[in-house]
Every structure is written in structure tokens, then in C-alpha cells.
Amino acid sequence: MHIIELIKALILGLVEGATEFAPVSSTGHMIIVDDMWLKSSEFLGKYGANTFKVVIQLGSVLAAVVVFKDKFFELLYLRKGEVRKGPRLTLMHIFVGLLPAGVLGVLFEDYIDEHLFSTKTVLIGLVLGALLMIAADRFGKRTVAQTVDDITYKQAFIVGLVQCLSLWPGFSRSGSTISGGVLVGMSHRAAADFTFIMAVPIMAGASAISLLKNWQYITFDALPFFVVGFISAFVFALLAIRFFLRLINRVRLVPFAIYRIVLAAVIYVVYFA
């Protein structure tokens, strides 16, 4: 085992954790950091590297669970004390929000994996996602849902429809859902909270299915890389989520949209210029 490869695993976990929940496309960053620089497939193998990315994504999911643990306890009626009165987020809101993309994802998973995962499609997704985010800040409705507990079923469903755009690689799940939320009258913070809470079951489920299919690639020799990457992703996702939630109502989405366009330009220059 080489220390340099452990450092690469740590860096990949950092990139995953820092970008998974920000509206900047973790896929786009992995193209630059892994495919163009660290090349995890060289020390983990092609399928081992893909499994590694699933494992570090679970580190990010765990971070979201920690940040929103009180809300998850409330959703599952496990929170001690008096139950919140009045409007509140429920499991039905989550289900309604997940339904559209969940159905399309199951129906077209193989097609997406085979035909849509390429550098060119990610580049297109980065730019189109940026335009959606700019449009959300410019044309979003007057805020009627200040907090995640004010969200209606209609808003949740529309956000779910917009989330279907994230099936296109590079579009970004959080970028599409936060934009969709703002467009239908959620505050930026409410849209972000709903996005992150909704991401946990769908990411955990997808990762679990992938691991069941590919668990054999987590070998004894490769295990240290998986552990380091998982812990790194967890720590940096924890920091990134908390930082983003403090930031989003102040800076809104346009700065992230500009960053995405710059990232797309870098990928274009490196791959196509």
C-alpha cells in the first residue's frame, strides 16, 4: 500500500463531500479531479473505482443524516416531547417529491448509464443547470414557504418534477431542486433544507443497490482506501452542508451558477479545445 494512494482517496472523499450537496455538480468535479488527475481506476481497477465512489457518497449521506437528525426524528415520530402543531414537513411530502424522478430513474436507468454519462453531456448539464439557477433567482415567485415546514404537497411535487432534470449528468440534484423550490415560492433556505432531506433516502437507496451488486470489489487490500475516502467524505460533507445552509439565503444561486459555467469552460478547454 502506498501512502500517495491513500492521500488520493482522502482527496476524492474531500471533493465528494464538498460538492455532493452544493449546486455545482459533484459529477463534474469528479471528472476533473479523478478522471483527469488522480485516476483512482489505476490503483482500484475500473469497477473498484466505481464502487469506491458509491462508498464515499454514503459518507456524504451520513453527514446529511447527522445535520438533519432532529428533522428525521420528527418525520419518523421518534422525537421526544410535544409533537409540532400546525403545518409541518411529513413523509408524504418526501414521497411526493421523490416520486417523479424515482419513477423515471427506474425506467431509464440503463439508458442513462449507457448513453448519457460522458464528458460532453456533463458539460451540457453544467451549463443548462446554471441557466436554470439564474432563472430561479430572477423569476422565482414571492416567498410563501419560509421554512421547510411551510412547504405544500403541490410545491413538493413540482420540485420533484424539476428534479427529473438531474437525471441528466452534470445538472446537479441540489441545483435542480433548490431552483425548483425557489421558482414555486420557497425561500432559498427552505428549498435547500427540503433538497437535502429528500436526497437522503434516494441516495442511500441507490447506493445500497449498487453496493449489493458490486460488493466483491471491496477487497481486503482495497479496504483502507474505502475507509479513508468514506471518513473524508463524511467530514467534509458535514462542514460543507452547514456552511452552505448559512450562506444560501445571503448569496442566493447566481454565484454558484457562475462557478458552474467556469467549471464547464475548464472541462471544455481540457477535453475539446
Swiss-Prot record:
The chain crosses the membrane at residues 3-23, 48-68, 89-109, 116-136, 151-171, 192-212, 225-245, 253-273. The keyword Transmembrane applies. It is found in: Cell membrane. HAMAP family: Undec_diphosphatase (MF_01006). Belongs to the UppP family. Bacitracin is thought to be involved in the inhibition of peptidoglycan synthesis by sequestering undecaprenyl diphosphate, thereby reducing the pool of lipid carrier available. This is Undecaprenyl-diphosphatase. It comes from Anoxybacillus flavithermus (strain DSM 21510 / WK1).
